[in-house]
């Protein structure tokens, strides 16, 4: 029987000093011997997705204590990608994922915690904590802060549902008045919570449901709704049960690596493809699999993308649909339910809350459940009142959206498209692959060819787009923005938003070794691997070269013959794989350390220390 890890610091004469320190935190004689549960919070006043988490760690802690455990809370950092967007702050976003994973490992291992509840929400926090959970492999439950309500605004007599991206696009559109921009800005992000579309934060929180590490509703229940409190309460009780099952009953099935198996990762990726999740999820899923020593690669993603259809389109792919609408249609368990009906998931994978994912779907899919409680849960609606307070409203939809032919969630017989919402492309410009969110690509440009317009940084591309240098039919190439070349692999939300504001969202393509915000739509192809800084072919593209993109056939090619590419490579080797001109970018010691070990995106941009 495995001993509680915490006994290392709580038992034995020689641990008198450690016990003295534990007593100073409030522990009593009766607490020594109970499981010590780390409550891994990520509260910060910088991020709307985390601003309401301050008291939620203690809510979970009280439930842990009530269930017979000892709760100890600490915080990780949390970067707001939206606020960090469009300037050098974005260099820090992806590297923060590794810092978060490391900080969780440091705290949990230094203090010998037995298990943990991870309170995450936004873009890099859920992935960082997920990486830590699989690295540590102790009982863990995830509960996120929940999505923001969609903004609502009346413009020129018409009601619009809004999100962050609408504010960015409007601000760059000369045809939108200053007054209207102000109205949109003030309405786009009305409440606490992760931004309201199927952006990176919400995508990742949905995927934790499919991985089996969070409770049903984790990805879709609004941050403001009273129903979300139940998830935090239940997580506190559940983690104590999981800890006891492992340490007292030798039940290894409750460990993260035995829940989030390769089959579970396939389920998560199938969900991601079906719901058109953020392309960032590919990075994070690959990184989490790496930490769990799970053989899950771009080839697996490519295989799944060829057979899983697109069953849901949410903003930015469908501007008037947000997470509150997905919840009303049954949330993630109902998307998984439709995939299950099509034989596209592994039903036998265990979860933290049910014996198998199949059992969970049978109870929580609104099209098959007999539970009135479940049906009421998914009628949780937005309150429509701006607030930064969690659980502050109890609004309900009058009825659920169970329309699987024309509703927010479709059946496999009536998909938005037979091809899924994400695709892996390969070709001479991306020998190790690249990613496109097909759910956000207009059907008219699934096949596209055009001349390259080459930029050596995001800043240069933005300047060119705003100066009207880009024309319909162009392929914008932004390079040296990968994990190593950036460093930090910046998101390209501003370039894609500005293309949309110029009316080029369906008339141009953009490819990069950087990445995209979950708010990006259009023919935006990221994660080109190998990246330019690693000698990737994207570093050999020249102004005017023709690039051919064929999403149905999963190819992307630079129309330059091999002899010419070889000559260019020899020339570039001599010059060094770096931007032609010095960029006005302060690369600090912290960023240099990340760049020194960062891999290309096809490996999840994880650190390669040469030990695997």
Curated annotation (Swiss-Prot):
GO biological process, one term: L-valine biosynthetic process
Keywords for this protein: 2Fe-2S, Amino-acid biosynthesis, Branched-chain amino acid biosynthesis, Iron, Iron-sulfur, Lyase, Magnesium, Metal-binding
Reaction(s) this enzyme catalyzes, per UniProt: (2R)-2,3-dihydroxy-3-methylbutanoate = 3-methyl-2-oxobutanoate + H2O; (2R,3R)-2,3-dihydroxy-3-methylpentanoate = (S)-3-methyl-2-oxopentanoate + H2O
Annotated InterPro entries: Dihydro-acid_dehy_C, DihydroxyA_deHydtase, DiOHA_6PGluconate_deHydtase_CS, ILV_EDD_C, ILV_EDD_N, IlvD/EDD_N
Annotated Mg(2+) binding sites: 81, 123-124, 491
EC number assigned by the record: 4.2.1.9
Catalytic machinery residues: 517 (proton acceptor)
Pathway: Amino-acid biosynthesis; L-isoleucine biosynthesis; L-isoleucine from 2-oxobutanoate: step 3/4; Amino-acid biosynthesis; L-valine biosynthesis; L-valine from pyruvate: step 3/4
One example GO MF annotation: 2 iron, 2 sulfur cluster binding
Single GO cellular component term: cytosol
Positions where N6-carboxylysine occurs in the chain: 124
Top enzyme class: lyase
Cofactor (UniProt): [2Fe-2S] cluster; Mg(2+)
Function, as annotated: Functions in the biosynthesis of branched-chain amino acids. Catalyzes the dehydration of (2R,3R)-2,3-dihydroxy-3-methylpentanoate (2,3-dihydroxy-3-methylvalerate) into 2-oxo-3-methylpentanoate (2-oxo-3-methylvalerate) and of (2R)-2,3-dihydroxy-3-methylbutanoate (2,3-dihydroxyisovalerate) into 2-oxo-3-methylbutanoate (2-oxoisovalerate), the penultimate precursor to L-isoleucine and L-valine, respectively.
Assembly information from the UniProt record: Homodimer.
Protein family per UniProt: Belongs to the IlvD/Edd family.
Protein's name according to its UniProt entry: Dihydroxy-acid dehydratase
Lineage: Bacteria, Pseudomonadati, Pseudomonadota, Alphaproteobacteria, Hyphomicrobiales
